[in-house]
Every structure is written in structure tokens, then in C-alpha cells.
């Protein structure tokens, strides 16, 4: 095989694999099982993260946010304000999230939960419209990372971008 043939075959093989490279991101069957750790500090932070995910983000129980977020709560999402009051206002007033009283199981799909020192990162599947093809969708992974101080989230990061203005 000549070098030219080898390069051509390699290019065609890589092109074919690129067209079929993406596999959907899939969550685990029991996401709550990922929020446990044998290390007491990591377990406390993972459990607080579970409450943030379940009671706050899933069920909108923002009246309880002070149980798991500090007053300072440094927010790095460009759409939400920092501070406990700021993030509560963002979810309850700006997004209009309604409170659900029954909240006994996390239903959000979760791929993995990673804890290291004061940080907990949750990886979740996300599906978006494919901008290259009308009606098609693609999958990717969203993440939320929190830094904990004394068992409460004090700082948050995610890959959010600035939301477009609301349609008038």
C-alpha cells in the first residue's frame, strides 16, 4: 500500500467514524445511588447536592434553599444573580418555577457524580435541536459543579450561556 493510498483510506475511515461517532448520553437507573460516599465529608457534600438537585431544581422548593445554600452563594451562571436571595428570585420570579410539595425521588437523569475535596460535579444528559438539520437532535453532557463550605453550597458553575431576550 502506498502512502497516498494509506492516507486516503485513513481519511475515509475517520470521516465515516465522525459521521457516526456520537452516542446518546444516558443516565443511570438509580441516580440517587450516586450521591453516596464512604468519606464522611464527601458524603455530606454529595447529600447536599442531592437535595439541591431534587428539592430545589426538580421540585422548586426554593423556600428551603437556605438549608443547602449559603447566604453568599457565588453564582457563575450568567443568567442568575449571586447570593441566596438572588438565586431564589431567579428561579421563582424570573423563571416562574412552581413549588411541588411531593418530592421523594430524583427523576433527573444523572450520568455521574464526582466529589473531590469541597467540590461536587453532577453530569447529566442533555438533548438539543441540531442546528445543522431541521427536526434532528443531538446529545451532549451538561454539568453543574458546586463548592461546599460547612455542608452548604457556596459557589456554583455550569456551562450556561447568556439567554436571549424574551420574545415580545
Question: Where is each model-derived feature located?
Answer:
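Bacterial N-terminal signal peptides that target proteins for export
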Residues: 1-7
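Cleavable N-terminal signal peptides
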Residues: 8-9, 19
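Short, low-complexity N-terminal intrinsically disordered segments enriched in polar/charged residues
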Residues: 21-63, 67, 71
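Short beta-strand edge/turn micro-motifs at domain boundaries
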Residues: 23, 139-167
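A solvent-exposed, acidic/Ser-Thr-rich amphipathic alpha-helical stretch
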Residues: 62-118
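Short, cysteine-centered beta-strand-loop-beta hairpins and adjacent loop/turn segments enriched
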Residues: 98-101, 128-139
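A short hydrophobic beta-strand element
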Residues: 116-126
Amino acid at each position: 500500500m502506498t502512502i497516498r493510498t494509506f492516507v486516503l483510506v485513513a481519511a475515509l475511515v475517520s470521516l465515516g467514524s465522525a459521521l457516526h461517532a456520537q452516542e446518546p448520553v444516558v443516565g443511570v437507573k438509580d441516580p440517587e445511588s450516586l450521591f453516596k460516599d464512604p468519606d464522611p465529608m464527601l458524603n455530606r457534600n454529595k447529600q447536599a447536592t442531592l437535595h439541591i438537585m431534587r428539592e430545589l431544581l426538580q421540585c422548586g422548593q426554593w423556600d428551603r434553599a437556605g438549608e443547602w445554600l449559603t447566604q453568599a452563594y457565588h453564582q457563575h451562571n450568567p443568567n442568575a444573580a449571586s447570593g441566596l436571595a438572588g438565586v431564589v428570585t431567579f428561579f421563582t420570579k424570573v423563571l416562574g418555577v412552581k413549588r411541588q410539595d411531593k418530592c421523594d425521588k430524583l427523576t433527573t437523569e444523572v450520568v455521574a457524580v464526582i466529589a473531590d475535596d469541597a467540590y461536587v460535579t453532577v453530569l447529566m444528559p442533555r438533548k438539543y435541536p441540531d442546528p445543522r438539520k431541521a427536526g434532528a437532535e443531538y446529545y451532549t453532557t451538561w454539568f453543574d459543579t458546586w463548592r461546599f463550605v460547612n455542608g452548604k453550597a457556596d459557589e456554583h458553575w455550569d456551562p450556561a450561556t447568556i439567554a436571549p431576550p424574551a420574545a415580545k
